[in-house]
From Swiss-Prot:
GO molecular function: transmembrane transporter activity
Name of the protein described by the UniProt record: Choline transporter-like protein 1
Glycosylation sites: N141, N259, N480
Source organism phylogeny: Eukaryota, Metazoa, Ecdysozoa, Nematoda, Chromadorea
Family: Belongs to the CTL (choline transporter-like) family.
Organism: Caenorhabditis elegans
Amino acid sequence: MGRKKHRTIPAVEVYEKSDGFPMPTAPPMSPSRMDGVYPSHHVPPLHQAYHVQPASANHVPDQIARFNVIKPDRLAKRHNPQLYTKRGCTDVFCCFLFFVFLCGWVVVAGFGIMWGDPQRLIYPTDSEFRRCGVNLEGSYNFSKRPYLFYFDLTKCISYATALGGCQTTQLCVKECPSTYFSYLQLRTASVSEIQNKMKSVVYCTDDVDKTTVTTFQALQNLVQRGKCVSYTVKSVPVLQRCFPEAIFNAVDNVNNVLNSSNSLDYLKRTFGDDALIPQDIQITGQSSEVMKSVVEDQPVTHKVIHDLSQTWWQTLILIFAAGILSFIWTVIMRLLGSLIIWLSILIVLVALGFGAGFSWLKWNTLKTTGAIDDYSFHPAFDAYFEMPTTWLVVAIATSVLLLIFLLVILFIRQRISIACALISESSKAIGSMMSTLLFPLFPFLLHIGVFALWGSIAIWLASSGQEVCRLKETNGQVYNTSTKCDCTAKVTGCTYVGIEKESETIFWLQVYNLFAFFWLSCFVTALGDIALAGAFASYYWARDKRHDVPTFPVIRALNRAIRYNLGSIAFGSLIIAIVKIIRVLLEYIDHKLGKSQNKAVKWFLMCLKCCFWCLEVFFKFLTKNAYIMIAIYGKNFFSSAKDSFLLITRNIVRTVVVHKVAGILLFLGKSMITLGMGILSFYYFSGRWVVEGVPKVDLYYYFVPIVIVVIGSYFMADLFFDVYEMAVDTTFICFLEDSEQNDGSLERPFFMSEKLLEILGNKNDIPLHSK
């Protein structure tokens, strides 16, 4: 069959000695080589490096046939695309653009640091926007008042509104209330008792002089004006905010309700009712019946923490065991991958055949016994399966599926064999380069770093703004038109009024920051992919697998990518990042429109989101194959993407079969490892399996460590199988290139394994070593 040879080596180019492979020896009179680089017109002729038996003269070029011995392994190296391929910096403009963008990201971070203060998000603010627990020189000193107290929590709809600001007076306090109190208790109190309560349990705004409050009428007036609190409940600090303890502690909650003086209901019954005093049910949001049902219970969080503290080392051991099983599965796929695939196909055929046979038999039985069809509504769904037509439809459907599946298998059986052989070769590649299994830790750590950078900048930007202080007017009030003053200066009457924000500017800076996160994350992923692809490609194109594969193949491939291909990596990751940010903006627009959008707009947005999701999936597939071509030939991104896309479209059936077969194996591997570790952890943590010598653990919720083991096992398996998937994809692209560019002659030998040659019915004119 004719083969395209559009990748033949040009006549005059510069070739680099790469990965430690020996170059042919230069002739005595040739110019000196410099740093392992030769101009191609000084590369020594084949007859000076290789020797040929006279009997082979009819099968090799004339200039080789005059010599005695042929060394085909060395000859094959001349056609290794990783050795004799022109290498140079690719997509330099994109690389420059990427670094300019990173400089812009630094500028955005600088704006965030200049304008922002994360303490504004960490520390709560009172009704006058002053931060609790903070000392702002010249304005206020709340360093000894770290907690935020809400005058009336019933005006807060939810925790979210409480954290963001309730429509009630908020006050920074030294400590949260430790007792239940109603101002109605002081209706008949003496002056000394009122003054004592004002100091200890009554909270008022800072403009109230509590020492002047000596009568109940004065206190009632302040309460009605919102200057003093009408009640307090026993509270605990949560995120530096005071919340009723009853919400978090069921035991105390029940005790408060059941005829205890530690409740607002009791105080109302004893000292009188008032519209300003809520019921306990309004504060806690829980009924007394629910409280009673959990009277003997402890907080769930405490139990979960207890379970984790008791099982952390067993959990880590099981997750580590999942990693070992993942490695063992790669060995199993190497030895039994073909068997697993053909066995799966056989099981599907048998299942369809059994289903078809049973359905025809059931239809014949019902038809013979005189069963009738009645497809009116039946509450019992089983009634429809007592009708012959139902089984006739099922029989026809399963028979058609069986026939189609059988024809497809017969048509693509050779391609399935190729897929199995490629998977076996990928397993061999991983087995010979064990460092590939550890390499994903490197991009994983980089991803953590990128996420930390993005999160930090996002927090600084979210807290951006300028603190504004204004001078009080003659009437003691502060207005938006009042004169501004320096918050750090000790000026009489200078009052803190809030924070001014450039909302639109901050929004677009956040968009820039998010786009930087997407681009850099995709860049890190691409860098890891191209490094692994380079390592696996070096294995495929090595004739002698034991000697020609370079030492530290992943590090060499990573170095090659950083040295030459950063621009191409930036180009590919930029495409994915653009699609991602468009999808985020579409979600933002959808959220902003909310319920106001009509059905047409909603449908249009849904279509756009679906299209861009499909586009992202397609571009991820395209860029991944482009990175493999870059790792092999070192071309720019566009050329590599075009070559890989055309290569795949010319072999679309092979591509689909290989990806589906590999997907089945990887899915089976992930599922079996995750399911197996889940079952094992279930039997152990539930106490059904007792290990001799290992103390039995008593847990409140044994499903907690089981869930952690299952999730950890899945991610551990995914870590291994991502490498395996990259190995299969790279080996497949190399195989397609090998099939199209080589013909088995001495000048262009195949690099594929003997098994693949046998499946394709090809052979090399002179057998070359392939170990």
